[in-house]
Structure formats: C-alpha cells, structure tokens
Swiss-Prot record:
Keywords: Ribonucleoprotein, Ribosomal protein, RNA-binding, rRNA-binding, tRNA-binding. Part of the 30S ribosomal subunit. Forms a loose heterodimer with protein S19. Forms two bridges to the 50S subunit in the 70S ribosome. HAMAP family: Ribosomal_uS13 (MF_01315). This is Small ribosomal subunit protein uS13. One of its GO terms (biological process) is translation. Located at the top of the head of the 30S subunit, it contacts several helices of the 16S rRNA. In the 70S ribosome it contacts the 23S rRNA (bridge B1a) and protein L5 of the 50S subunit (bridge B1b), connecting the 2 subunits; these bridges are implicated in subunit movement. Contacts the tRNAs in the A and P-sites. It comes from Borreliella burgdorferi (strain ATCC 35210 / DSM 4680 / CIP 102532 / B31) (Borrelia burgdorferi). The keyword tRNA-binding applies. GO terms for molecular function: rRNA binding; structural constituent of ribosome; tRNA binding. Belongs to the universal ribosomal protein uS13 family. The gene is rpsM. It comes from the Bacteria. The lineage of its organism: Bacteria, Pseudomonadati, Spirochaetota, Spirochaetia, Spirochaetales.
Amino acid sequence: MARISGIDLPNNKQLKIALTSIYGIGRTRALEVCNKSSISPSKIAKDLDNDEVNRLRKVIESDYIVEGKLRSEVAMSIKRLMDIACYRGVRHRKGLPLRGQRTKTNARTRKGKRKTVANKKIASK
C-alpha cells in the first residue's frame, strides 16, 4: 500500500483515481503528477514499486500544497476575511452564502435547519 502525504492510496484503483484521495489533488492535478513523475496514469496503485512511489511523493511535496498545509491555508484565508470585516468575511461569520445567491428562499445548506419562530402567524395579524 502506497502512502503519500500521510494518506494511504486505495490499492485496487488506477493511479489517476487513487491520487484524488489526497486533499488538494483532483483529476486534472493527478494527471499532471503522473506526467511529471513519468508514470502511467492507468497503472493500478498496488503495482507501484518503491522507486515510483518515491518519485510521486517528491513531485507532490515539491510542487503542490496538499493535505494539512492546504487546509490551514484555506482556514487562514477565511479567518483573514473575517478579521478585516469585509462583505465576504461578514457572510462567513453569519453562515450565509457569499456569492450573491438569494436567501429569502433556498440557501438551506448554508443556513442550516429551519428555526421556527413561535406564534409568527399571530404576531403578523
């Protein structure tokens, strides 16, 4: 079992798919990594030898930000937006959509479960 960036790659999948289990590597970047390390993307992950795993590891660690470092970088970016109190930061803080979507209806995923207001119909009369 190949272990790259602290993640065990799934054994029975092609390399281009197995690499996507690493946070920060999608399909396109997985193909880039395979090409840079000169390994066939259709090779099964369990068939990799130590030399190939080391080449993959070296390419990923030198050229890309992945896993914990990427997660902390994203969190720091969001925290910076919240600290400077720009529009996006305020929306992050309130837990609302950031990019202009409507919120009168919809936006349930971002807002969470409905919070019912007691006696709303009585109060509106």
